[in-house]
Amino acid sequence: MWKNRKIDWLILGPYLALSIVGLLEIYSASSYRLLVAGSDPKSLFIRQFLFIILSWGVIVLTYSIRLQVLLKPRIIKAGLIVSGLLLAMMKLGIFAVTVNGAQRWVSIAGIQFQPSEIATIFLILYLSRFFRNDRSVPEKLHIPVLIVGGIAVLVLFQPKIAGALMILAIAGAIFWAAAIPIKKGLIIIGAAIASLILVAGLVLLLEKHHLLPSFFEHAYDRIAMVHNPFLDEHGAGYQMSNSYYALYNGGLFGRGMGNSITKKGYLPESETDFIFSVIAEEFGLIGALLVLFLLFLLCMRIFQKSTKQKNQQANLILIGVGTWILVQTSINIGSILGLIPMTGVPLPFVSYGGTSYLILSFAIGLALNISSRQVKEKNKQVERLQLKKPKLLNKNN
């Protein structure tokens, strides 16, 4: 089954290292809060550990199955339709779970997950198939544009502004890699930017007249706190200001594993959105930069592999997966550093969140499958050349 296939350790290695770091930091960041609340301090650690084991099984399965089976059109279309329906149903309150003023989660059979993450992976698969034949632009370009726009709007009104931007960024990268003509590309980009400006202007206008819908209020508060969270240190700027304290406390080498101060009630989302702050406090600037290096190495390796693909669909899948990890990392780190508003976007493979980790692991499995297939094709070419050599020698003799 794995004959002539070679695991790409520059993809798998950083993934495994980030998973282990994340698991240890989830325990460190959550144990004190759970202990004070009278819960098992290891409960989140155990839950994440189980999801990691399950996800590693998904990677093995995804790596083992033929790529053509994973990329069947019916599966891709069904996944896209189901995720779109779940996003729409959330606005109707069906299966929806509201957390911190936002309806981003769906709860089915006791399992909570974000449909936007499922939509993202199937959107990558759909777009890669749409542009699979060649690098020219198909005549029906309006179809993927409408699908991307529809999903982005549904995600935006959860509200999840960062999620909508991520979807647009991933789709934009795939469109660019598919070599869309400059004129059509500029029209698409212009329409996307104009739509975002229109939405932002509408939000500001509604806020001015105190008509802002409740589902956008928390997003507006986060935007207002970007420049100086210390103006409302105990209110809207509470998490951001304490994140700054954590970064400052860490210094160059950190306070040591488990010795974070801000995780003790000062940083409510310490094991999810702000886990990077806890890492920086416990392991210092050196440890934080190492985590970023692993994420950067993972992305760059995926992008590098995409440039070597002869198959257009495989190339675009790698572009989409690499962009997803890179943009999600940038948004998470950018919000922690105060460069952009707080977003609620987790750090890939490090933050607590079983289903998020599972879906991203499936994406890594696809990347490993494509990478190993490239090695297999090279081995076949070498075998053909070796078979031809004796024939050539016999002719010469």
Curated annotation (Swiss-Prot):
Residue intervals annotated with topology Cytoplasmic: 1-6, 66-78, 126-136, 182-185, 299-315, 368-397
EC class name: transferase
Annotated metabolic or biological route of this protein: Cell wall biogenesis; peptidoglycan biosynthesis
Gene Ontology biological-process entries: cell division; cell wall organization; peptidoglycan biosynthetic process; regulation of cell shape
Keywords assigned by UniProt, alphabetized: Cell cycle, Cell division, Cell membrane, Cell shape, Cell wall biogenesis/degradation, Glycosyltransferase, Membrane, Peptidoglycan synthesis, Transferase, Transmembrane, Transmembrane helix
Top-level lineage group: Bacteria
Family indicated by similarity: Belongs to the SEDS family. FtsW subfamily.
PANTHER family membership: CELL CYCLE PROTEIN (PTHR30474), PEPTIDOGLYCAN GLYCOSYLTRANSFERASE FTSW-RELATED (PTHR30474:SF2)
Protein name in the entry: Probable peptidoglycan glycosyltransferase FtsW
